[in-house]
């Protein structure tokens, strides 16, 4: 059965100035109704080049407790490396449809990798206005080049270079999260799988939408340990804070860091997995490049023992990551 891609629907919808019913959110979810207007939140910005490591640790820890999201600048990844990553991803989504379908997710596949549209069980049959491409970029043993675009030819080099540079940033983030709770520096990285941690790249492609007031990405928390995201220049992130949805402002050349479910679990609830969603734009294509830092499927994740005691009993079960992911994607209780 042929799957209709959002990119194709967008080009048809442009002509008739409407969108199919399955992309229209329920009234209480629609961005025009559910968003606090006139207020743009300044997501915390943390300078990773600061010579005072204690200060960085304090800022990362505070942002992870209060927000579950922050931006990092002077992170050590050259702007040119990020620009190339964006360039080759944009090029892929501009290819003819039949060429993109060559690396489509096989029907019935249990793997998340490949080009696709529908990701998980949609709430009330509603769909997100987005196409995507998933593939693993690290470690080498986890990579399946079958799902990496052959076109543009520079795609592989750009992604491998970004993966190489990202590792140091990720290691430091895990260290700061650990030190922020008075743990050993490797506590969070080891708890999430250590050197077997999987780096899963996703490219989100949100085409222009004739009715951005009606469509939304699905509100969710990330099931990863942490997510490190590169946005394009079109804003569209909303964060749920203090009972309301707010638009968030990015700053140029920053990486956006989301605390995911596995860090919330390991921290026994001290750090918060950020509840977020995306809006779409009438005129412009929005793209983003999140990398999900995921435990290996059989790795067990649970609260770090040092954070559990009589006053603070375990708030989460310890379970294999693949079992957690299955429950999350199928909307089953954990």
Curated annotation (Swiss-Prot):
Domain Fe2OG dioxygenase span(s) in chain numbering: 196-295
Record's function text: Catalyzes the formation of flavonols from dihydroflavonols. It can act on dihydrokaempferol to produce kaempferol, on dihydroquercetin to produce quercitin and on dihydromyricetin to produce myricetin.
Annotated GO biological process: coumarin biosynthetic process; response to molecule of fungal origin
Keyword Metal-binding: yes
InterPro entries xref list: DIOX_N (IPR026992), IPNS-like_FE2OG_OXY (IPR044861), IPNS-like_sf (IPR027443), Oxoglu/Fe-dep_dioxygenase_dom (IPR005123), Plant_2OG-oxidoreductases (IPR050295)
Top-rank lineage group of the source organism: Eukaryota
Entry protein name: Flavonol synthase/flavanone 3-hydroxylase
Enzyme class: oxidoreductase
One annotated GO molecular function: flavonol synthase activity
Organism whose genome encodes this protein: Eustoma exaltatum subsp. russellianum
Record keywords, A-Z: Cytoplasm, Dioxygenase, Flavonoid biosynthesis, Iron, Metal-binding, Oxidoreductase, Vitamin C
Bound cofactor: record note: Binds 1 Fe cation per subunit.
Pathway note: Secondary metabolite biosynthesis; flavonoid biosynthesis
EC number: 1.14.11.9, 1.14.20.6
UniProt GO cellular component terms: cytoplasm
């Amino acid at each position: 059965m042929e799957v209709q891609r959002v990119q194709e629907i967008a080009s048809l919808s442009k002509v008739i100035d409407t969108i199919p019913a399955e992309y229209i959110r329920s009234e209480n979810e629609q961005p025009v109704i559910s968003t606090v207007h006139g207020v743009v939140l300044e997501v915390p910005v943390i300078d990773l080049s600061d010579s005072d490591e204690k200060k960085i640790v304090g800022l990362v820890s505070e942002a992870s407790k209060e927000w579950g999201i922050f931006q990092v600048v002077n992170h050590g990844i050259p702007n040119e490396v990020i620009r190339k990553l964006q360039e080759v991803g944009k090029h892929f989504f501009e290819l003819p449809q039949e060429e993109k379908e060559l690396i489509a997710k096989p029907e019935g596949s249990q793997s998340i990798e490949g080009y696709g549209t529908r990701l998980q069980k949609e709430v009330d049959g509603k769909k997100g206005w987005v196409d995507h491409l998933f593939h693993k970029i690290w470690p080498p043993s986890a990579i399946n080049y079958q799902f990496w675009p052959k076109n543009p030819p520079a795609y592989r080099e750009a992604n491998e270079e970004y993966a190489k540079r990202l590792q140091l940033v990720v290691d430091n983030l895990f260290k700061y999260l650990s030190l922020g709770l008075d743990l050993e520096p490797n506590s969070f990285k080891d708890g999430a799988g250590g050197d077997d941690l999987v780096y899963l790249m996703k490219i989100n492609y949100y085409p222009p939408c004739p009715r951005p007031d009606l469509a939304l990405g699905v509100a969710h928390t990330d099931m990863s340990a942490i997510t490190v995201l590169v946005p394009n220049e079109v804003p569209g992130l909303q964060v749920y804070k203090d009972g309301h949805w707010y638009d968030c402002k990015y700053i140029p050349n920053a990486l956006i860091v989301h605390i995911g479910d596995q860090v919330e679990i390991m921290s026994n609830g001290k750090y918060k997995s950020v509840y977020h969603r995306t809006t779409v734009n009438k005129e412009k294509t929005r793209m983003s490049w999140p990398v999900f830092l995921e435990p290996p499927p059989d790795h067990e994740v649970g609260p770090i023992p040092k954070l559990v005691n009589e006053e603070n009993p375990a708030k989460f079960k310890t379970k294999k990551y693949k079992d957690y992911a299955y429950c999350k994607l199928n909307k089953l209780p954990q």
